[in-house]
Amino acid sequence: MTVYLPDGKPLELPEGATAKDVARALGEGWERRAVGAIVDGELYDLLKPLPQGAKVRLLTEKDPEFQTLFRHTLAHVLAQAVKEFFREKGYDPESVRLGVGPVIEKGFYYDIEAPEPLSDEDLPAIEAKMREILKRDLPLRRFVLSREEALARYRGKDPYKTELILEIPEGEEISFYQQGDEAYGFTDLCRGPHVPSTGRIPPHFKLTHVAGAYWRGDENRPMLQRVYGVAFRTAEELKEYLWQLEEAKKRDHRRLGRELELFLIDPMVGKGLVLWLPKGNVVREELMAFMREEQVRRGYQLVTTPHIGSLELYKTSGHYPYYAESQFPPISFKERGEEEEYLLKPMNCPHHIRIYAYRKRSYRELPLRLAEFGTVYRYEKAGELLGLTRVRGFTQDDAHIFCTPEEVKGEFLGVLDLVLKVFATLGLKDYRARIGVRDPKSDKYVGDEAKWALAERQIEEAAAEAGLRYTVEEGDAAFYGPKLDFVVKDALGREWQLGTIQVDYNLPERFGLTYVGKDGEEHRPVMLHRAPFGSLERFIGILIEHFAGDFPLWLAPVQAVVVPVSEKQEGYAREVAGRLKEAGLRAEADTRPERMQARIRDAEVQKVPYVLVVGEREKAEGAVSVRRRKKGNLGTMPLAAFLEGALREYRERRLEPVF
């Protein structure tokens, strides 16, 4: 057989040759350094047979793909270590049943059914076993079995592997990887790719935690235990990641939500349903006020729609039954003689469409921009719910723009400007855009070919004019139109998808929307969906972690606390707090019978931006002694001067303090 090297040179090899044979043919240096290969654009290990005529580029430990290889093998090492861990506890290793063990961002995991529950306390012992396996430098071997042989290997022992084998299509290769020997090594059903031996894995890894995971993500199936690990090429990368992990725990919005009394999720109210406490509601209302101001300034018209809608509305839109699994079931009153069925609103767009359609529209009315803070409901699986970032009821800063095909670019530019204003106001400086366009090989898309081409071109032109750093992702468009979204990095460098703008040719067609053009004829409008915040709940969860609960003044639930030095100044403290409130600031006087330093410390713990200490001197001079969080004591100033500066900082929505 013939394969081709990166420079185009042919290399003759025996049938069934692998990348290992390529390395051997290129000399001792390559044979020693090679860890894998890129074969016709696909990642291979050194063990998988090469196809005839393949283009082969060998990889070394310096190549970025090396991380994928060793992380995958570490998942197998983890599974082997767990089996050895339970063998030492007196269990048959076969009693440890294995699900799947893929590579994920930063590391790997394995889903395991163990004879007794694993806990985070078990991880150091399992990790030590993994390091032993690396030191043994066990070579990996790849082999293929027939379907019957593969099933015989697991039948009656491991229902999860049996199920996976049964799902492999007829005629497709069923491959296994073995590290070490059959008696004391480990063999797993796997497509690969892997490193050549366990000794090639860098020792810079750590098992992080154990979590529950339903088999195949189905809450009606058995609950397995998912053991997570992270792995890097260097000790420095691992150290940096572990620091980020600890910092992320400190910033966890669920913990800070409790400590700062922002929100709660009460089991009696329901899983995934958020109760906004007074302080959290301040953050929510401030964000909504900011967005409302910006939208009105940009020509949006605000509407309000109900929390439920007729089932027929969602059948027409296609949201039902196509997305029925992620929706609450229909509400029926047929037993009361009511024929109409209802659905908790999963999307705002059908309601906005009916507002557009209630009368004839002219091209002179376009673009028509309808906006709403609309609450919608999705049935997320219980195991997928997570604080504010994955909930069952959430409010979107939703808007739908109805325009002519020629207006798409201008409207896109307008929405981009709004999204970038949001990012700038909140200090989200590190972002990139992704433009999702059609896959030319797919026929799943609806709408006119010429309109698609125009919209894709307009989106790219708008992104370029806005000065965005963007990539074009072929095949990422929805079936009903191209889109643009943003990937934003927070203070810890984590990436979040925000600010999606979606072109839609489908819904105007399904609802028969029209406008009368300049020619007096009826035409089909284009619809744009946009929500810069996305879900307010998720967005606030991200902001809590980005700011570590230390909000800028305009978002801070309590902006200033006035602390009297002694009982003699309590009246003045209340007077100062009253003045601040009258001016529009959120202020409190802390006159509890605690030591002054304890009250100042409590305000710090609650992340209040300003603490105003008042003693006899301040009372006599109509002044305040100002402490700014993270800056300390700023000295004494007239109350009027503080008020003027604080109001400017608040009203201008500044990120940095005035003082």
Swiss-Prot record:
InterPro entries given in the database record? aa-tRNA-synt_IIb, aa-tRNA-synth_II, aa-tRNA-synth_II/BPL/LPL, Anticodon-bd, Anticodon-bd_dom_sf, Beta-grasp_dom_sf, TGS, TGS-like
What does it catalyze?
tRNA(Thr) + L-threonine + ATP = L-threonyl-tRNA(Thr) + AMP + diphosphate + H(+)
Q: Which GO terms describe its molecular function?
A: ATP binding; metal ion binding; threonine-tRNA ligase activity; tRNA binding
Pfam families, A to Z: HGTP_anticodon (PF03129), TGS (PF02824), tRNA-synt_2b (PF00587), tRNA_SAD (PF07973)
Output the CDD domains linked to this UniProt entry. TGS_ThrRS, ThrRS_anticodon, ThrRS_core
Question: What are the residue boundaries of the TGS domain, all occurrences included?
Answer: 1-60
Q: How is the cofactor bound?
A: Binds 1 zinc ion per subunit.
Q: What family does the Swiss-Prot or TrEMBL record give for this protein?
A: Belongs to the class-II aminoacyl-tRNA synthetase family.
- The name under which this protein is listed is Threonine--tRNA ligase
The scientific name of the source species is Thermus thermophilus (strain ATCC BAA-163 / DSM 7039 / HB27)
